[in-house]
Curated annotation (Swiss-Prot):
Region spans: Disordered: 232-257, 310-379
PANTHER family, alphabetized: LIM/HOMEOBOX PROTEIN LHX, LIM_HOMEOBOX PROTEIN LHX9
Example GO BP: dorsal spinal cord interneuron anterior axon guidance
Record organism: Glandirana rugosa (Japanese wrinkled frog)
SMART domains listed in its UniProt record: HOX, LIM
GO molecular function annotation: DNA-binding transcription factor activity, RNA polymerase II-specific; metal ion binding; RNA polymerase II transcription regulatory region sequence-specific DNA binding
Biological role: May be involved in gonadal development.
Cellular compartments per GO CC: nucleus
Disulfide bonds: none
Protein known as: LIM/homeobox protein Lhx9
Length: 379
């Protein structure tokens, strides 16, 4: 440093002032470090009070030291207790129960988010797969059946936090007879995956949103034939659901009480094919729905035809079942008010005997319907 035009006394005074300011700056100099996300300024050492290192327990005589968790550390002593990584150059460190951890080891041991497959911790910087409320490692997001890794755009199903590919999930729900297949579609957003439910429409295409109910032919339900060997107190119905054609459906069984079965059999002896108004009154009388009654009468007609053919082919075999009585013709006495009143008394009698003769002409009684007087008197 050159001084021109200044006397020696002034130069000596300037040098002393610069030295004094340099010592003052050294005393105020400190090093900062973030502890658990907070920045902490390291105060300078005071020569009056010796400071002990929290790591090795020795006296700190260095010019600079580290302050973490309200304790002083040598630069070389602040290390992760797991991997022994020196933290003097790290921006953050974490403390738990008096131990110091680096960021990776802290998240690995004490992370709140855990993989739903391997149950290990997930680092905050790690890319994950999300499905519903569960989080998975990329390597753990695989099909439970075949262990194939699922990627963005693949369809999958979930059951009890277990992931299945679409084909395997279909086989799974076929065994459980689920009413709907709830798949999940992957879409990459924000490093994770969002779950979108969809439904199959039976043609291999994907139908988004709420599935439409298909219109069933005839009565709106698939009728299961009423065989002669089945229980007469039960009727089988197919669930009216949007199943794919190849998927097996579960039958819903309806049990009839004695008075319900007695009433339907007695009316079947009068008319094999009741209309909508008759079914409504039958439903009010028996407590059954019109849909169940429709299926019962259709099954009873099918059983009647089979027994009739068996009787004709077998040469006079005895016709079984109380529902095999043919309805009387429209001009018979059964449709008069007197005959209807007699039928009503038979309905309320516990010892009902329906033993009417079988009329082989089936076309005439299926197209006809009993008169209003007969149905009113019947109930």
């Amino acid at each position: 440093m050159l001084f021109h035009g200044i006397t020696g006394g002034h130069i000596q005074g300037i040098m002393e002032e610069m030295e004094r300011r340099s010592k003052s700056a050294d005393n105020r100099l400190a090093k900062t470090i973030q502890v658990n996300g907070r920045e902490t300024r390291m105060p300078p050492l005071s020569p009056e009070k010796p400071t002990l290192c929290a790591g090795c327990g020795g006296k700190i005589s260095d010019r600079y030291y580290l302050l973490a968790v309200d304790k002083q550390w040598h630069l070389r002593c602040l290390k992760c207790c797991e991997c022994k990584l020196a933290l003097e150059s790290e921006l953050t460190c974490f403390a738990k129960d008096g131990s110091i951890y680096c960021k990776e080891d802290y998240y690995r041991r004490f992370s709140v988010q855990r993989c739903a497959r391997c149950h290990l911790g997930i680092s905050a910087s790690e890319i994950v797969m999300r499905a519903r409320e569960s989080v998975y490692h990329l390597s753990c997001f695989t099909c439970t059946t075949c262990n194939k890794t699922l990627s963005t755009g693949d369809h999958f199903g979930m059951k009890e936090n277990l992931v299945y590919r679409r084909a395997h999930f279909e086989l799974l729900v076929q065994g459980d007879f689920h009413s709907q297949l709830n798949y999940t579609e992957l879409s990459a957003k924000g490093g994770g995956l969002s779950a979108l439910p969809y439904f199959t429409n039976g043609t291999g295409a994907v139908q988004k949103g709420r599935p439409r109910k298909r219109k069933s032919p005839a009565l709106g339900v698939d009728i299961i034939n009423y065989t002669s060997g089945c229980n007469e107190n039960d009727t089988d119905l197919d669930r009216d659901q949007s199943y794919p054609p190849s998927q097996k459906t579960k039958r819903m069984r309806t049990s009839f009480k004695h008075h319900q079965l007695r009433t339907t059999k007695s009316y079947f002896a009068i008319n094999h094919n009741p209309d909508a108004k008759d079914l409504k009154q039958l439903a009010q009388k028996t407590g059954l729905t019109k849909r169940v009654l429709q299926v019962w009468f259709q099954n009873a007609r099918a059983k009647f035809r089979r027994n009739l053919l068996r009787q004709e082919n077998g040469g006079g075999d005895k016709v079984e079942g109380p529902s095999l009585s043919a309805p009387a013709s429209t001009d018979s006495a059964a449709l008069t008010p007197t005959g209807a009143a007699s039928t009503l008394s038979d309905l309320t009698s516990p010892s009902l005997n329906v033993g009417a003769s079988v009329t082989p002409n089936m076309d005439s009684h299926e197209s006809g319907s009993p008169s209003q007087t007969t149905l009113t008197n019947l109930f």
